[in-house]
Amino acid sequence: MKGVNHYKKYKIQPVEFAQANELNYCESNIIKYAVRHKDKNGIDDVKKIIHYAELLLELEYSDK
């Protein structure tokens, strides 16, 4: 699979990992931003991880 430079150093692309493990949208975005934050957008990507984690909490656990 083709990949952009900030993912090429990994054995598997985040999208391939997400697909193989049937991750939902929030989970796959958390993985994507966690993998790339050091090579691309730094703190902005970490903030996106937090955003998607909070969204995951709301969607999956708000009634518990």
Predicted regions and their residues:
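Intrinsically disordered, low-complexity regulatory regions
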Residues: 1-64
